[in-house]
Amino acid sequence: MSYESDTREAYRNKTKASAYKNQYITGFKWARFTMWKQKIIINNYLNSCQFDSDDSLLDIPCGAGYIGEILAKYSCSIVASDISIEMMDLAANEYPNKNFNGFLQSDITNTPFQANEFKCVVVLALMHRLPIDIRAQVLSEVFRVTNKYVIISYSIESLLQKVKWKILSVISKKHIPAPASIPLKVIIDELNSCGLTILKKKRIINFLSAKVVFLVEK
């Protein structure tokens, strides 16, 4: 998998951006179900952050506004950012919060934000698409701009997941596993090495999903 073509530039395309959003808003799809489950976990983590009106949160990459409705419940100011203008166009109506401060196009490895600007940075559906060097750049930048919390998702590589992927590849030739699933120990080591402490971790669905969401603290 090429990081540049399959991730960084992939969703700067209206057709692909729309297809991404449709997977969790239309029909009964496994992706839609797991993303719904993920929202429950994210909501619980956000509650733990105890925001007030002086706080701010960064949703990056915001994609098509997947968690915009959840964020609307909180009194903190919200900023959404993505490298894809096409994705942000689709997210235009997904952040109803009166404290929404708008969209800003940026690369998550090199954002224009101030150090310690946000009480929480949310990074979803990204890390499993990145090679190790880019993951390190992302974590370094996220550490720089948060002053307290990070909510971040990964896809975990494990023996059980390998068995599941093998079964699904037989059942459905169209099944494509996460392009860069990572062993749990590697994830923990990467988070700790950049100064982030894991407070909570939760699998979306045990065995059936490789996705795990972490709440970490600076």
Regions inferred by a protein language model and the residue ranges of each:
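Short, well-ordered alpha-helix to beta-strand connector turns
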Residues: 75, 118, 146-147
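Short amphipathic alpha-helix with an adjacent loop that forms part of the alpha/beta core around
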Residues: 113-116
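Short catalytic micro-motifs in class I SAM-dependent methyltransferases
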Residues: 125-129
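A short glycine-rich, Lys/Arg-flanked "PGG" loop and its adjoining helix->strand segment in the class I
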Residues: 136-148
